[in-house]
């Protein structure tokens, strides 16, 4: 994944490059041959952070404010944010918006025009907590 990112989107933010790379740690192919990420061992780390109210916002993640704080949590957060977008068929469009030079917040606003950043973050957290 890293080699493909370096070719297709060399300016990709670290959180996206690592989120996509870790997304495919556990994956399957759908009937059309497309790779789809699935839940994996990183899920409990993320769920625990949400329950303890220790998870930074998606805005903080995309702004690069969180990587040094807790690497395990950072990787889980980036991975499951990509999985969240994948489940909603927005991962490809989100990637393309970023590649066009939009920030993560701008890309989310284009894909979720009727939702605030806080609403998207809340939807993400609720979705993560229901995963098994």
Stretch-by-stretch model annotation:
Residues 1, 5:
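Short alpha-helix carrying the canonical HExxH Zn2+-binding catalytic motif
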Residues 7-132:
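Acidic/His/Gly-enriched intrinsically disordered linker/tail segments
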């Amino acid at each position: 994944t890293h080699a493909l990112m370096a070719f297709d989107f060399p300016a990709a933010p670290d959180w996206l490059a690592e989120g996509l790379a870790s997304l495919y740690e556990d994956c399957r192919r759908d009937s059309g041959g497309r790779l789809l990420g699935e839940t994996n061992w990183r899920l409990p780390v993320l769920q625990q952070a949400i329950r303890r109210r220790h998870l930074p916002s998606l805005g903080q993640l995309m702004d690069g404010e969180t990587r040094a704080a807790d690497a395990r949590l950072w990787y889980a957060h980036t991975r499951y944010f990509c999985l969240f977008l994948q489940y909603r068929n927005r991962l490809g469009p989100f990637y393309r918006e970023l590649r066009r030079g939009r920030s993560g917040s701008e890309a989310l606003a284009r894909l979720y025009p009727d939702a605030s950043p806080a609403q998207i973050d809340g939807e993400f957290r609720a979705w993560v907590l229901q995963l098994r």
